[in-house]
Amino acid sequence: MFKNEYQGGAFVEIFSAQGKNPGAKWKILGSPSVIWKEFDKEVKSFVFVLEGSSQTNRIQLPKENKQILGLIQRFLVLQIYIPLGQDFSTELLITDLGNIKRRLYLSTVHKEVSSTPLHAKIPLFMIQRKIWCNLCIDLVAFTSEIFKGAVFQSLDGIIVSANCKLRKIFTLKSKPQETADKDDEPTDIIPRSCQLATDVPHVTQLLNMTKLRQTEIKFGGHPLRSAESEQFISSGAGSVQNSKGQDVCHIAFGSRVLGPPPLSGRRNNLRQSTETVRSIRYKNSQLCQQPTEERSVNSTEVSALLADQQGEKGSARPLKQTTPLPAKLPIPYPHPPQEPSADKGSNRRRLRLKSSSGDRTEAHCGCSSGNNRSEEDVVMALNSIPQLRTEPVRASTPEPPAPEQPDEWIFPESGGLTSDPAWSSPPLLLDEDSHTASNLWLETSKDSEHDQAEETQRAPKDIFTFSSRPRSAPHGKSHDMSPKGCPFTLDTQDDSQVTKEDPKLEGGFYGSESSEEEYNWRNYQPSQMSESELQMLASLRRQQNEDLEDTGAPHGLSASQVDHCNVSISTSSDDTTTWNSCLPPPVNQGRHYQKEMNPPSPSNPRDWLNMLSPPIVPPSQQPVEQSLDSSASLSVQGEEDPRVEEDEEVLTLLYDPCLNCYFDPQTGKYYELV
């Protein structure tokens, strides 16, 4: 627009609010209610008023993006009035001698100078408000100091956003005389045609990198250094900060920055955390392969290793003291989540085993056939896992060979998750190698039953639990059976054998006591039970008596499986495989399992309502699990089992005594008893 016009004079006027239609050449973005021309009595002339949001209400020159202004003079002056408490911003499109177009964003919103190879954000917090101001922008200085090696050629676009009053926009060939200016550089006065009236209070402010540095010092920050290093431009993300909580050298515009760049700091922290997790996993897997005497590792060593690695990367932070890590137990322990888990996207559905004390255990369930004594030992081993002492496990205890464990001691990558008592237990995991692991666990439990029983009685203070909910697989998809994510994963072939061969093992899980500290269910029992729930419990008891008398084991299930069908529905998995041998009991049943199965002879429901009733699902939403047997499925309230359908979801219902209904944590729905 101005490329072919003479620009050798003292100034070139770009915009003036005077005249019939001053915005004819401008593209106005905003309704007339927020952008209009009015006569200002203070300056005794017309002004353009822009109000509202600075992101939507603005004026742009030139109208078409294909056009360019071609303004070559060094200084751009905006004659504006910015009200108190309002944001203001302007955007300048400049072209350097290499014909590369770059943008300068000047805004009162920005608190620091930051730049990429093509964009720069410049703060305007030093601008004076509630007074008319000749804001003079040094285009040559910003171009050369922000974009390293660039030389200003022309100003090709201007965008002025709300909120402000705009009187004139023009360019100057020489630096204007600034208010309270003490520089010795040659200055010039603003041309008479562009000056405000002498009786109008106004100031002239020059904006360049030197002024920004001086303002930074005035506002209590550290001085900004001149552009000396190529690291600022080569990285494309250099910035100038107030250096709050950082060293002085972090606040360097173009100078050397010792720490990570601020804009990509979070990305670097995530990358460093990932590298630390991988290193910890690798070293722990090596520890598991060492001799027995060297396999007991304290958590302080692991914490020190993590702190050292983070300290080398410049991002060390305090670590919480956790329980010891016995490397000889092939079981990942609960840990305080600091960041979302790295395997967030996996489709594995984890089974949960709840104990009567409210703790969750993460265990390896074996599925080999053995005598009842061995199976009870397995239960003792499983239940004593979260009750580890704060000293290393004795090396003399026999242990199974530890497999490769990619999941041992995972340190999550992001903070902000709070622990929820309702979801305070780790998942129960099963592996393809569960046959072998079970036999090894049986042998181990025989020799170390007394040691583990003593450990069970000592509850450590620093037991950490998971705070994230277990996730289910998407509809229509089976779970991820690969062993890469967890030490044990469910195998479909093992599952069918579990269902058919191990009724004793199932009973062992329910009959054992998982903790010395009993869960006080009386604190969470509703004072009154509804009639529908009483009827349901009565029918449940009748069905239990009939099933106990029936020696034929109806529905094609073993006797222990029928017991499980009558006591609890699957509260864990929506997998297409059937997993009946390790179904967890309802949250408050624990050691009262036998008491519920054999109620007293008087048929008074209030005599045996001391425990929480099992989860009840409406018949229309009866949970169905696919079984490799022809007819193995669950039964609720004496109704016939629906036919097994593939990929049908199993509901996980939790009883809410306050609302007297059942809650599905996955869908957020509540179910009432009918």
UniProtKB/Swiss-Prot annotation:
Biased composition range(s): Polar residues: 266-302
Comp. bias regions, Basic and acidic residues: 444-461
One Pfam family per UniProt: CFA20_dom
PANTHER family: ORF PROTEIN
Protein name per Swiss-Prot or TrEMBL: Protein CFAP20DC
Chain segments carrying region Disordered: 255-425, 444-522, 571-646
SS bonds (residue pairs): none
Transmembrane segments: none
Protein source organism: Mus musculus (Mouse)
Biased composition (Pro residues): 327-339
